[in-house]
Design a protein with these regions (language model features):
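Alpha-helical transmembrane bundles and membrane-interface segments of multipass inner-membrane proteins
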Residues: 1-173
Length: 173
C-alpha cells in the first residue's frame, strides 16, 4: 500500500477517535482536542491527493476510498455539530444525502468496471465543508455557518455535476 493510500486509511481510523473524543466528554479542552483530530484527518485528504498526483501514485483504491473517507469524516463531525446546536439539521441531511447518493453512483460505476474520480466541484465542496466544520467545531459560527451554506451550494452543484457526467451509467440501469 502506497503512502497516499495509507493516509486515506489513517483518515478513516481517525473518525472513531474524533467520535469518542467529541461525543463522550463535553469541555472546551476536549472540543479543542476533537477539532485537532478532525483537522489532522482533514489535512490527510489534501496531503494524500497531492502525493498521489505529484509522484504518480494514483490508484483505483485511492480514487474510491479517498472520497468515502471524506464522507465518513465530514458526516461524523456534522452530525455532532447538529447535536450541539451549531449547525442546522436540514443542511446536514442534504449534504449527507448527496454524499451517499454519489457513493451509490460510484458503486454502480465500480460494478461496471469504471472508477469515478473526484471532480473539481467535488473538491471545492470538500474544502468548504472541512473548513466550515473546523470553524464550527471551534465555535466560530459567524464565519463557519456562512461557509457551510457555501458548502451546501457546492455540494448540490457537484452532485449534479457527478450525475451529469455519469448519466451514461445511470441510463444503462
Amino acid at each position: 500500500m502506497n503512502t497516499p493510500n495509507k493516509l486515506t486509511v489513517l483518515r478513516l481510523l481517525l473518525v472513531p477517535v474524533f467520535f469518542v473524543v467529541a461525543y463522550f466528554e463535553r469541555s472546551k479542552e476536549i472540543y479543542l482536542f476533537a477539532t485537532i483530530v478532525y483537522s489532522i484527518a482533514s489535512a490527510t485528504d489534501f496531503l494524500d491527493g497531492y502525493l498521489a498526483r505529484k509522484y504518480n501514485l494514483v490508484t483505483d483504491f485511492g480514487k474510491f476510498m479517498d472520497p468515502l473517507a471524506d464522507k465518513v469524516l465530514v458526516a461524523a463531525a456534522m452530525i455532532f455539530l447538529v447535536q450541539v446546536g451549531r449547525l442546522p439539521a436540514f443542511l446536514v441531511v442534504v449534504i449527507v444525502a448527496r454524499e451517499y447518493a454519489i457513493s451509490i453512483l460510484r458503486a454502480i460505476a465500480s460494478s461496471q468496471g469504471t472508477v469515478i474520480a473526484a471532480a473539481k466541484g467535488g473538491k471545492i465542496k470538500t474544502v468548504t465543508q472541512m473548513i466550515g466544520t473546523i470553524l464550527l467545531l471551534l465555535n466560530i459560527t459567524v464565519i463557519g455557518l456562512p461557509i457551510m451554506y457555501i458548502a451546501l451550494i457546492a455540494t448540490i452543484y457537484s452532485g449534479g455535476e457527478y450525475i451529469y457526467n455519469s448519466r451514461h451509467l445511470i441510463s444503462e440501469k
